[in-house]
């Protein structure tokens, strides 16, 4: 904890020399621990996840409020690519940045939050090193979560609204709320059509359509209750 505090005291720019501010040990002792200390990462992560699940699921049982599993990914950019860096950073790659609209060099992580009744906790931060797809990473998260004690929801962007992920979360009691890419194929009333074509025929007066305003300027998104339930198992690439 003293290490974490010393890092944040300097505004995310903490160095080993700052350990002396919050620790009674000499900075070289702390540095030695960071460089050579041994601990079981998987056991630590398992214990942390277990405590978070216990707290969030207990809150859901006592309050009756839904659990939200929130997934997103981000890139920690680095200024110099490996061809220019004197000491290339381990596990850094070029990733497609939707924010910048181009390839960005750095570390990409998938973050998973669990939230219920105003309590939001970080369940997992997984480094995306391209040995496993982001779709598979999130599917594994869905598989390891216990079944939700109440009706709950998985929140994501259009990258994660795939049939496999939605099915995995549905098996654990989580319905998906997420954006759809316009080229997704849906089957309303058993009729095959693109999401873009279906959207053109939606009307505000339709009893199955609920307008949801998202903080994106003048943009509004429509949510069709019938479709979201019907197509949990029928969404295809």
Language-model region placement:
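An anionic, glycine-rich sequence signature occurring as long contiguous blocks
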Residues: 131, 175-237
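Domain-level cores of phosphate- or acyl-group-handling catalytic modules
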Residues: 130-197
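Short, conserved catalytic/metal-binding motifs centered on acidic residues
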Residues: 16-20, 65-79, 112, 154-161, ...
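Electropositive, glycine- and tryptophan-enriched low-complexity nucleic-acid-binding patches
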Residues: 28-33, 37, 93-151, 234-237
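Short, structured patches in soluble enzyme cores that scaffold and shape functional sites
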Residues: 114-116, 125-127, 158, 178-182, ...
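Active-site-proximal, Lys/Arg-enriched surface segment
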Residues: 36-119, 217, 225-227
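Short helix/loop capping segments that flank catalytic or ligand/cofactor-binding pockets
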Residues: 78-80, 122, 164, 187-188, ...
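Gly/serine-rich nucleotide phosphate-binding loop at the start of the catalytic core
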Residues: 1-44, 48-49
């Amino acid at each position: 904890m003293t290490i974490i505090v010393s890092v944040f005291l300097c505004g995310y720019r903490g160095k080993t020399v700052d350990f002396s501010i919050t620790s009674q040990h000499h900075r070289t002792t702390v540095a030695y621990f960071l460089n050579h200390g041994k601990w079981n990462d998987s056991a630590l992560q398992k214990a942390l996840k277990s405590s978070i699940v216990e707290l969030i699921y207990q809150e859901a049982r006592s309050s009756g409020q839904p659990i939200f599993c929130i997934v997103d990914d981000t890139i920690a950019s680095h200024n110099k690519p490996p061809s220019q860096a004197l000491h290339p950073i381990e596990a850094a790659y070029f990733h497609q940045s939707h924010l910048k609209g181009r390839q960005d060099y750095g570390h990409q992580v998938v973050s998973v939050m669990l939230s219920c009744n105003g309590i939001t906790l970080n369940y997992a931060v997984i480094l995306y090193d391209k040995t496993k797809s982001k779709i598979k990473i999130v599917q594994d998260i869905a598989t390891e979560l216990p079944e939700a004690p109440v009706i709950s929801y998985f929140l994501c962007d259009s990258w994660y609204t795939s049939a496999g992920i939605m099915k995995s979360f549905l098996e654990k009691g989580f319905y998906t709320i997420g954006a759809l890419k316009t080229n997704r194929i849906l089957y309303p009333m058993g009729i095959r059509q693109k999401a873009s074509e279906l959207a053109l025929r939606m009307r505000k007066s339709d009893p199955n359509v609920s307008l949801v305003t998202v903080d994106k300027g003048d943009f509004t998104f429509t949510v069709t209750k019938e479709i979201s339930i019907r197509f949990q198992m029928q969404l295809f690439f």
